[in-house]
């Protein structure tokens, strides 16, 4: 199965609006038992999340996984920092890619692949307001063209 495919649990649509994605990479997430149950129930939010590399390890920060209903004392803090599973070569590549100005690691989507939770990280550069307007304008033009073609084909 190619990267980014599987049973999609959560998507970060705002990331594609706020950032231009340069490259993507797939990583596993270290979760506790109650957290994976919440992820399978699609109770995860990526909106404010980002990833960082500290001491040669990748970490997922500010991603909210809601506490599991029947988890009682085993529930973790919903906003806790979670370790990402990447190989050393991938981490060094990410460090080199992030050295550019304005580059960041943004979680694009979380999905289940062969029973494991995976996150698709995007190496992203922030968009300016005028870039966002251009994207919206281009999207509207494509929509208009499709509408015209559809009406001509009828």
From Swiss-Prot:
Choose one Gene Ontology CC annotation of this protein and give it: cytosol
- Where is this chain's protein located in or outside the cell? Cytoplasm
- Which terms in the Gene Ontology molecular function aspect does this entry carry? RNA binding
Q: Which GO terms describe its biological process?
A: trans-translation
Q: Does the keyword RNA-binding apply?
A: yes
Matching Pfam families? SmpB
Q: What is its main location?
A: cytoplasm
Name the keywords, alphabetized.
Answer: Cytoplasm, RNA-binding
Similarity comment text for this entry: Belongs to the SmpB family.
Q: What does this protein do?
A: Required for rescue of stalled ribosomes mediated by trans-translation. Binds to transfer-messenger RNA (tmRNA), required for stable association of tmRNA with ribosomes. tmRNA and SmpB together mimic tRNA shape, replacing the anticodon stem-loop with SmpB. tmRNA is encoded by the ssrA gene; the 2 termini fold to resemble tRNA(Ala) and it encodes a 'tag peptide', a short internal open reading frame. During trans-translation Ala-aminoacylated tmRNA acts like a tRNA, entering the A-site of stalled ribosomes, displacing the stalled mRNA.
Q: Which NCBIfam families match?
A: PRK05422.1, smpB
List the protein's name. Answer: SsrA-binding protein
Species, as recorded: Streptococcus thermophilus (strain ATCC BAA-250 / LMG 18311)
């Amino acid at each position: 199965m190619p990267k980014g495919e599987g049973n999609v649990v959560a998507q970060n649509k705002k990331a594609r609006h706020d950032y231009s994605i340069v490259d993507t990479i797939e990583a596993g997430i270290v979760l506790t038992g109650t957290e994976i149950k919440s992820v399978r129930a699609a109770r995860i939010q990526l909106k404010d999340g980002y990833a960082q590399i500290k001491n040669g390890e990748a970490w997922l920060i500010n991603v909210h996984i809601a506490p599991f209903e029947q988890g009682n004392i085993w529930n973790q803090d919903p906003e806790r920092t979670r370790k990402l599973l990447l190989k050393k070569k991938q981490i060094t590549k990410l460090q080199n890619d992030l050295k550019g100005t304005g580059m960041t690691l943004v979680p694009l989507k979380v999905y289940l692949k062969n029973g494991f939770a995976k996150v698709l990280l995007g190496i992203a550069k922030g968009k300016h307001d005028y870039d966002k307007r251009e994207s919206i304008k281009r999207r509207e033009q494509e929509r208009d063209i499709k509408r015209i073609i559809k009406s001509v084909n009828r």
